[in-house]
Amino acid sequence: MALKERIGTVVSDKMDKTVVVAVINRYPHPTYKKIVSRTTRYKAHDPENTCVLGDRVKIRETRPLSAHKRWAIEEILNKTSQAKEVKK
């Protein structure tokens, strides 16, 4: 069975070794044929905490790593220039 892959944007990086990736799925409405956008948020494993807010990433399906985390960061496609702030 092939592993699923998704491309999305990091919308939260506040957790340790975890990021939230928003994936936008666009499809035509079955009756009205208008293009509808649906956003799904996935929690993905980021072991080195390399992703920051706004990064475009590719995630892949993996074994369950926690109660809600079943995806892992495969690669960072577009890195944002936003520097991560250090809390004091």
From Swiss-Prot:
PROSITE patterns according to UniProt: RIBOSOMAL_S17
Cellular compartments per GO CC: cytosolic small ribosomal subunit
Pfam family, one: Ribosomal_S17
Keywords of the record: Ribonucleoprotein, Ribosomal protein, RNA-binding, rRNA-binding
GO terms of biological process kind: translation
Matching InterPro entries: NA-bd_OB-fold, Ribosomal_uS17, Ribosomal_uS17_bact/chlr, Ribosomal_uS17_CS
Top-level taxon of origin: Bacteria
Entry's Gene Ontology molecular function annotations: rRNA binding; structural constituent of ribosome
Role, per record: One of the primary rRNA binding proteins, it binds specifically to the 5'-end of 16S ribosomal RNA.
Similarity comment: Belongs to the universal ribosomal protein uS17 family.
Subunit structure: Part of the 30S ribosomal subunit.
Name of the featured protein: Small ribosomal subunit protein uS17
Source species: Prochlorococcus marinus (strain MIT 9301)
